[in-house]
Amino acid sequence: MDKRNSHKGAFWATVLSNQQIRTCYYRLNLELEPAATPVFGSMSPGQFAMLDLTQVALPSQDKIPSHLQDTVKRQLILRRPFSFSDMSIENNDLGSIVRLEIMYCVLGPSTVRMTSLSKGDKVNLLGPLGNGFELPEQKDLAILLAGGMGAPPLLHLASVLKTQRPQCRVVVFAGSKNCDHLPFTVRIGNKTGVVLEEFEQLNVECFVTTDDGSAGFKGFVTTRAEEWLKKNIWQPLKTIVYACGPEVMLSATAKLALKYDIDCQVSMERMMACGVGLCQSCAVEHKTRQPEQTEFRLCCQ
């Protein structure tokens, strides 16, 4: 386990806002209790928390998507993992307070319940968990590949890179099945094409791809990223690739980085029961340095 931030704990968070940004995507903003500041204040992009949603009520019947009407009847027992799209530390009368932003997609009984959270509600979370992204100081170009709901931790990473590594150029490639599945505030610009406002606010270069061509480049983020690499001047030793998204995309990203001899970090995501390695349910098979050999490692570690 990464020892850069091995501290974690269970804390209460107060809902500040819960905004729908796309058909099935929401942005949840939380303020943690003061005791969480020493722990979450040093959190790295890419880490996550396990939310306890067992006591959160379902929304009214008319607000539950029709295809989830039966699914939401399942009883919740376990916490659910969520990464963060932003983290900030604010000062108020109580001292330093951590605020977190979670972007989530409504997919099942847990996330359906999350849509009913409103300002002032409280939820319990366990974290921060997992390993965050590393930020090498010698890099002057960071290429971020975000696939679907793999986008939140990369939005957080882009923000941190802009503030902590101002000398590093950040270029983002964000992809999804179609325009409706881009988990961002989307705007069509007259000159700039498809604009993702969250990255625009960070003053970060961003290229959009969709499988069906309904927004931006038609194709995969890895294809668009390779086109960019071929057309621009960059140095392999001073470049790093970060990625989060579907595993097939992460595999393609790793192959792309290997082809161009670029350092690469990928964030793996799995459904899990505990988030701390006890349940062993998030094992991921990966290659070793020995040809034809693989081993399993836990996604949460």
For the regions a protein language model found, what residue spans apply to each?
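Glycine-rich, flexible loop segments associated with nucleotide phosphate handling
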Residues: 39-46, 69-80, 96-99, 186-201, ...
